[in-house]
């Protein structure tokens, strides 16, 4: 990610997080690979998947 790009914040429910996590997992599963898509995209998808999973684990630990 470029350091000059702005960061954004959004408010999401845990259901939103679960849906996004599933969507990212499916995108990784069917990712066509390079050179059809840039290889950095796959690394970013892994990062997003892991970040969303950490949120879900945090929710389970603190809310259930």
Where are these regions (language model features)?
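Positively charged, low-complexity terminal tracts
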Residues: 1-64
